[in-house]
Amino acid sequence: MSASSGTGHKRGHNPLIGLDIDRLEAEMGRYHNWLDEHADEAYIVAEQARKLGFDHKEFVEIPRAADLAGRTEKLLIEYLEGYEVADDIRKLLAEHDRETTSIMMAQSVARGFRERGYDLITAIDVGLRVGLAVLTEAVLVAPLEGISEVRLLNNVDGSQFVSVHFAGPIRAAGGTAQALAVLIADMIRRELNIGHYQPTD
C-alpha cells in the first residue's frame, strides 16, 4: 500500500464532497420552523389544559425563548416585575462579550430599579440576578436559587456595605461564575454609591 492511500489520505478526506449544501441547509431551516410551530401548538394545548385547574399551577412554568436575552427576561420574570431587559441585553451582546455584558446589565438594572423607587436591597438583588443569568446563559438555576439573600450591613464607622449570601445551587454556575457574581455585586454597589466592606483586626 502506498503512502498516499494510507492513513494520511483518509485524514484529508472531505465528507462534504458531493453533497448539495444549499438543499441540506434549506431542509434544516424547514425542519427548525416545523419544530417551532409544533412547539407553539403544544404550548397552546398545555396552557388550555392548565387552565382547567387540575395541576398545582394554572400556567406552564417553563416559558419559551429564542435567545439568551429572552431566556434571561423570562427566567427572572418574577423578580423583574415588568422591567424589560431583553432588548438591552441584545444590544450589549452585539458589542461586548458575555462577561462584560453581565456586569453592564447588572449595573443598568440596579440603577433602573432605584430610579423606579425600589429600595437599595431590591435593586442590588435584581441587578445581581440579571448579571448572573446573562453570565450563565440563563440555563441554570443559580440566578434563581443560588442567591439566598442580599443584605446591607454596617462597617465599624457606620458606613454600609453589601453582603451577598449564596446557597447550594450557586455551585451549578461553576467556580468562575461564582467568583464573577461577587465582582458583579461589587460593581453594582459602586454604581449605587454604597461603601465597601472594611475589615477589622
Regions found by a protein language model. Give the residues of each.
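Extended, Lys/Arg-rich, non-catalytic nucleic-acid recognition/anchoring regions
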Residues: M1-D201
